[in-house]
Amino acid sequence: MPTATAAQPLRPFGTVLSAVVTPFTASGAVDLDAAAALAVHLVEHGHDGLVVSGTTGESPTTSDEEKDRLLRAVLDAVGDRVHVLAGVGTNDTAHTLELARAAEKAGAHGLLVVTPYYNKPPQAALAHHFTTVADGTGLPVMLYDIPGRSGVPIETETLVRVAEHERIVAVKDAKGDSWGTSWVLARTELAYYSGDDAVNLPLLAQGASGIVSVVSHVAGREYAAMVAAVDAGDLVTARAIHTRLLPAVRGIMTRTQGVVAVKAALELTGVLSGRAVRPPLLPATPEEVAALAADLALAGLAPAPLDA
């Protein structure tokens, strides 16, 4: 296995990835043409990886068949240019295995496996779940540690244990435990990817390999420049980019659900023609869109605020 260096961390899935939204038609169907066009747009704007059917892809409200068709559409559009990961995590190990095998058959380059949610497994059960899924295909696995949604963290010793599996190679970290992250980075060869746009720069400075971002839908080139600056040891430039993007992070990640806001941002910037989401989520309100437009303008990412 290759080893990281002070200048170049391990990057099994690239550096700048979006947790890609799933476009829907006005009638609520998955819009495969829009999904393919969005994938091309992201690749042309700083991304070297995409995650399909993650939380921001509204995976809890898409069927297995829809997930498969969506993944294939993205792979057909950009699979020869960037890393494409399939979100396959559920709170049912057997179902996760089914999704993982379907993703492998479709041609995915890797799997994103979130901590099982709601049933709150203890750490030994988490390790069993992750290694069982990793055993089930030949694809590399990125774990997704997000206790704010799943209810359970992946503890440091559990990460160290599962890192011994040859196909568990990365972690999407949205836990907010800088101390624990430092220990895992020191004790394993797991590649860390920031899963929280508010702490992209701190995690990169700690040695993270890259980001799996929501805000990158409208700031991919900026985040690519941030990663490059950190690689070059130019934290002054990296910090300037981080500071410039703060209003966008606020607008997309704090005023409503990230997927709701980022779909509105993609509509504001002309990338998507609508901002439909699936219930129980609701689209951004006119007031939310106006506030978001102001935040994007402050970050230099959109025109002046729209009238509500």
Swiss-Prot record:
Enzyme Commission code(s) on record: 4.3.3.7
Cellular localization per UniProt: Cytoplasm
Cysteine-cysteine disulfides: none
Catalytic activity: L-aspartate 4-semialdehyde + pyruvate = (2S,4S)-4-hydroxy-2,3,4,5-tetrahydrodipicolinate + H2O + H(+)
InterPro entries: Aldolase_TIM (IPR013785), DapA (IPR005263), DapA-like (IPR002220), Schiff_base-form_aldolases_AS (IPR020625), Schiff_base-form_aldolases_CS (IPR020624)
Broadest EC class assigned to this enzyme: lyase
Keywords from the named record: Amino-acid biosynthesis, Cytoplasm, Diaminopimelate biosynthesis, Lyase, Lysine biosynthesis, Schiff base
Pathway(s) where this gene product acts: Amino-acid biosynthesis; L-lysine biosynthesis via DAP pathway; (S)-tetrahydrodipicolinate from L-aspartate: step 3/4
Residues noted as binding pyruvate in the record, renumbered to the chain: T56, V212
One Pfam family from the record: DHDPS
Entry's Gene Ontology cellular component terms: cytosol
Biological process terms in GO annotation: diaminopimelate biosynthetic process; lysine biosynthetic process via diaminopimelate
Record-annotated active site: Y144 (proton donor/acceptor), K172 (schiff-base intermediate with substrate)
Record-annotated site: Part of a proton relay during catalysis: T55, Y118
Source domain of life: Bacteria
Gene Ontology molecular function, alphabetical: 4-hydroxy-tetrahydrodipicolinate synthase activity
Function field: Catalyzes the condensation of (S)-aspartate-beta-semialdehyde [(S)-ASA] and pyruvate to 4-hydroxy-tetrahydrodipicolinate (HTPA).
Subunit field text: Homotetramer; dimer of dimers.
Protein family membership: Belongs to the DapA family.
NCBIfam families (UniProt xref): dapA
Protein name (database record): 4-hydroxy-tetrahydrodipicolinate synthase
Annotated gene: dapA
